Amino acid sequence: NRIFALEIDHSNPDIVYFESNGDLFKTNDGGLTWSEIGDASFQSEDHNVKDIVMHPSISSELYLSSNRGFFKSTDGGLNWTEIMDGEFQEIEINPSNALMLYTIKVVDNRTEFYKSTDGGNSFTIQTAGWPNPTGPNDHQERVEIAVTPANPSLIYANATGSANGGSGTYGIYLSQDEGTSWTFQCCGGQPAGPPSLTNINMMGWDKEGEDDGGQYYYDVGLAVDPVNPDKLHLGGVNHWVSNDAGVTWVCPAKWSEPAEPGYVHADIHDIRFFDNELWIACDGGIFMSTDGGTTMNKCQV
């Protein structure tokens, strides 16, 4: 069975939550036994859970996004309150203010960015500078967001979709004011468009970013270095790195170059930092780096 969302208790690693095939499970004994959790109302809905996030200091408080809405639990997942209905994607918590949450909603052919300042009890949409597909064939339905303790006011967004005659990377966006407003960082002078050396597509198979399309609906990842707020790691088919806040990007090693020290298997789904270790989950397993991604090592799992 595929697992689409997982969270580990920050204070007790024996407590783990995960979603599989629309059901939510919890273990209290390090995975020896599992129980399906959620009240009757929650379990009655066919959830496609996209993210589960735990409050950084209150382990009984959880946030969950799914195709059915944005939910909050205050009792370790036994009961869930729907905060917003609709289809939601990723959740992030401000690194210096646990009352401030961010999440992404999908509406028709676009995404919307929502911000909470009261611990996820209510949200407001923030539209200034956010991707806005307007053409008859344009769409922008997937976003990964990332934050960093190095600068808690920053939020990066990796938006994918199609516009202006090209598809794949729709744009890299940056907020410097906790999501109130956004600026377009990359690539080229407009969202999407035909790929070229000056308008690269990081969702495709090409190391130079000159091929159109890719798997921008399937493998999308983003993380910010915990020490350097200008350094980003992005995942699509390949692993990409930016050292200037998302303006320019390089691919250290193509998916088909396993001999290169920076090689990561194709189809990246998640990128995370644990302290200063970089971890990447992909269709080839898990890769880890202790030098900021210069050298990637495959983990034996």
Range-by-range predicted roles:
Residues 1-301:
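Extracellular glycan-interacting surfaces
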